[in-house]
């Protein structure tokens, strides 16, 4: 039987939320173990080359990969933080034991508190031949280009005009790839105007109320058929277009990766505003399973800026519940809550606020 690893706070997921949680908890004095399934922490940050918005505290003006490197360095230089990479958590059990697999070994951890920061996965959509080589999720395209330096093709159709679709389209243009167009099923663009304006200035059409009806090609993508949608989201006959492309990139949203929350018997609820099933929690991010916190996209899909603040809040609350930071934790917690309110104050954030209000649970957090 494997030896059990005793730790005060276990953080599952080394993306923006997980790294921020680790730093915050360790800064208050808690001993932290962070588990990341990839060979390097950072999550989505390592492939983001665009500059962040917000305040200086949310790293405004810095690029995603720079923020990721900074958070990784903070974890690596803090003696209170231990990081296991290339390790996958398998389960959270009734007795509090967490099992994981890493480098061919079966591992057991017995944490006092758990923060789940597993992020989200890309959604896909159904259309004929959507399994052809050359059809990618937007995150995969970012990884190919910004991590490995490989362009996915020469002519791209982007599906989805949210922030991810707009940002990845611009990054494709910067890499010398032609973006023949961006289509969006909704009648309005979901992403920020600043991103859409850059795309339009580059001459890329953004077609709202449009969808893909079929991809085609012999051994890989050679083209796509698209059409316009009416107010009932039905195809309008005679509006079909045939676009010659070798890549179709899907940026149609994310789904919270909540499998561990389900398995840990957290009370869950489907909330469309938060992009799927998410755990009930209180404002301090503690779920209905006492001692288990959530942060980042696993608690509802938002921007990375919000994920980092949520991670910081979860780390503070988990550490405080163990008796750390009695002199400063409440002040830090109040500051983090205020930052989240500020980030969610705009029109885009109101959707998130509406979703969160459906979830609020009294919980048992000591913050």
Give the location of each predicted region:
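Residues forming the flavin
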Residues: 1-367
